[in-house]
């Protein structure tokens, strides 16, 4: 996994996941999956606080809750582009940050994911915020590994 500052208000994160592209895309567009990994370590995103309408103009809303003190962090975005299973683009209403997630089939059961954030607010560019974002990618990798293991078990039963 890597991340870089591509410009003064732009961040790029990349990660390779051991899961097929269709599954990785599905997990990013369905609340019952997002609830397992959305947000950094130490937060949760209850499924009842996640709304996903994956179509251009559709909403993407989440509420992350700090597990230690119960603080809530709502986010509302609108999808600009939805191209299954290749790309998701949304713009956050409050900050104006645009997020482009590109899913690349690397063959077999490997998927490359690039997350490009543009017009990134100052607080999101902090080292602490970037470290938190990386922990959410770690949580996503763990969730995908558990899903893939479950699917392999079911297919051999």
Show the residue positions of the predicted features.
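Short amphipathic alpha-helical signal-transduction/dimerization elements
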Residues: 29, 137-148
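Short beta-edge strand/loop motif at the mouth of beta-sheet-based domains
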Residues: 12-13, 32-72, 152-157
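Intrinsic-disorder/low-complexity, polar/charged segments enriched in Ser/Thr/Lys/Arg/Asp/Glu/Gln
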Residues: 8-14, 21, 59, 74, ...
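Hydrophobic pocket/interface hotspot
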Residues: 24, 34, 60-62, 79, ...
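Short, hydrophobic/aromatic-rich segments at coil-to-beta transitions
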Residues: 55-61, 83-90
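Beta-strand/loop substructures that line and gate deep hydrophobic ligand-binding cavities in soluble
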Residues: 87-135
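Hydrophobic ligand-binding cavity/cleft-lining segments
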Residues: 1-44
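Hydrophobic/aromatic beta-strand elements that line small-molecule binding cavities or substrate pockets
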Residues: 15, 49-52, 75-81, 98-105
């Amino acid at each position: 996994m890597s991340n870089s500052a591509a410009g003064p208000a732009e961040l790029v994160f990349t990660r390779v996941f051991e899961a097929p592209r269709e599954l990785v895309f599905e997990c990013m567009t369905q609340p019952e999956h997002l609830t397992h990994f959305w947000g950094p370590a130490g937060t949760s995103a209850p499924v009842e606080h996640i709304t996903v309408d994956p179509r251009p103009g559709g909403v993407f809303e989440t509420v992350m809750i700090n597990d230690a003190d119960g603080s809530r962090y709502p986010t509302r975005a609108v999808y600009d582009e939805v191209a299954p299973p290749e790309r998701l683009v949304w713009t956050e209403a409050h900050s104006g940050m645009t997020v482009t997630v590109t899913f690349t089939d690397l063959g077999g059961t490997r998927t490359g994911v690039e997350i490009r954030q543009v017009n990134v607010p100052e607080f999101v560019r902090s080292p602490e915020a970037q470290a938190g974002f990386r922990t959410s990618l770690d949580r996503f990798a763990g969730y995908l590994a558990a899903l893939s293991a479950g699917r392999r078990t079911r297919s051999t039963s």
